Every structure is written in C-alpha cells, then in structure tokens.
Design a protein with these regions (language model features):
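Catalytic beta-strand/loop module used to bind and position nucleotide/cofactor moieties
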Residues: 1-2, 6-133
Length: 133
C-alpha cells in the first residue's frame, strides 16, 4: 500500500536543497492531482497534505505523503513516500514525522481504489518531467 521512492541524485550542479525538496513536493502534489486529489505542502509541517478530494473539502487536512532526505557529498539519499492503500491502523501507533493532532490518509480512504501499477505509471511520468538536474 505505500509507494516509497528513493532518489539518488547528484546535486553537485545545483547545490540548492530547498529547490530539491520543492521538486519532491511538486512530484507528489502533481501525481495526486492526476487522481483528483488537491494537496499542498506547508512551511510549518513536513509532508504532503490533502485539502480536497473528489471535489469535497476535508474538515481537517490529512497527511498523505512524507519527504525524507539525506545528503552526503551532494548526493541525495531517500526521498518520498505516498499512501496509496496501506492499512492505516498502523499509523495510529506512530506519530508520523513527529506531528501530533493530524491524521494520515490514503488514496483508498479518499475513495480512489487503484492498482499500484496505475499509480506507478503516473508517478514515474511526474518524476521524469520534474527531476531534471
């Protein structure tokens, strides 16, 4: 149920971590948009947050994606994860990214039940489009 993408990118040509994180956010947000999910990133909370799905606003934003990177000698490690259809009960046992008072969601919980292959096709297209270094 959770799609995790580890990107090992040489950032030596463009040594700008904020730009790199913004690209990871854009890939996530644009992928979700293809499935009629409106999501955003927030300056005060790490991750990708759903505000609207299938033309319905959520009462409170829910986290659908995480971003975690490590940089060593300007080579990126780790990357993003997006919740397609995981068992959300496991998330009740943890404090995702150390953020309290917010729930975690998935495409499936939002009423979008797709095969991982379909999700992967869209995600890969967005990575190819935006990950230009």
């Amino acid at each position: 149920g959770q799609r995790v993408v580890y990107l090992m990118i040489n950032l030596n040509k463009k040594k700008d971590l904020r730009y790199f994180v913004s690209i990871l956010e854009k890939i996530s947000i644009e992928t979700l948009k293809e499935f009629n999910i409106v999501s955003v990133s927030r300056n005060d909370r790490i991750g990708i947050w759903v505000t609207k799905s299938n033309n319905k606003y959520l009462k409170k934003e829910k986290k659908i994606g995480a971003i975690g990177i490590r940089i060593k000698k300007w080579i990126s490690f780790h990357g993003i994860s997006l919740n397609v259809k995981p068992d959300l009960n496991y998330f009740k046992q943890i404090n995702a990214c150390g953020i309290k008072n917010f729930e975690v969601t998935s495409l499936k919980e939002l009423g979008i039940d797709i095969k991982m292959e379909e999700f992967d096709k869209v995600l890969l297209a967005k990575i190819k489009k935006y990950m230009v270094f």
